Amino acid sequence: MEGSLMTEAQSKIRISVRNLVEFVLRSGDLDNRRSQGGKKEAMQAGSRLHRKIQKRMGADYRSEVALKHQVREDEFSILLEGRADGIITETSGIVIDEIKCIYMDVERLEEPDPVHLAQALCYGYMYASEQDLDSVGIQLTYCNIETEQIRRFRQAKTREELEEWFQGLIHEYVKWARYLYHHSI
């Protein structure tokens, strides 16, 4: 860009899907950790349960699918990276599964946590774009760490809906990136 002081290296941002959605959307926290002291144990228990759920899902379930997506807005080139917990191939189409292990009673959940849903929507957009799909299913799988009780929330999204939502998310993130870049010393 003529007149821009920004170099190509300075304009590149690499961020995980989780960090992006947490930064833009975080306003509260679903009670998935009882205390800071038990955080390591809770994370280990959650990881074990996560793998157990994935193994139960069968042959049509691909676990830990790495995804990358490059997007450019204004002077920024953003590389978004992450791993979809699962991609399910069904006769009706593809479903992106995001698994969250929590201490909360899953029956008390009325809807997915907005940050968790945003993470799944990002993966849905990234996968639909990469595979040139018209639509995908978005599934949030919540599992109680102590009881192993599962509750799922599912919705269908067109690629157009996902793209519109994703562009809004990136636009909000770029507002911050632009401010930080232009106001840093």
Whereabouts are the PLM-identified features?
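Metal-dependent nuclease catalytic cores that hydrolyze phosphodiester bonds in DNA/RNA
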Residues: 1-92
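A helicase ATPase "motif cassette" and its flanking acidic/Ser/Thr-rich regulatory loops
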Residues: 14-17, 167, 182-184
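Histidine (H) residue identity feature
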Residues: 50, 69, 116, 171, ...
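Hydrophobic residues within well-ordered, non-membrane alpha-helices that form the packing/core
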Residues: 53-57, 127, 170
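Secondary-structure transition/capping residues
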Residues: 60, 64, 134-135, 177
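Mg2+/Mn2+-dependent nuclease catalytic core
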Residues: 71-166
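Extended, charge-rich, solvent-exposed interface segments
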Residues: 166-173
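Pre-P-loop entry segment of helicase/translocase ATPase cores
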Residues: 175-185
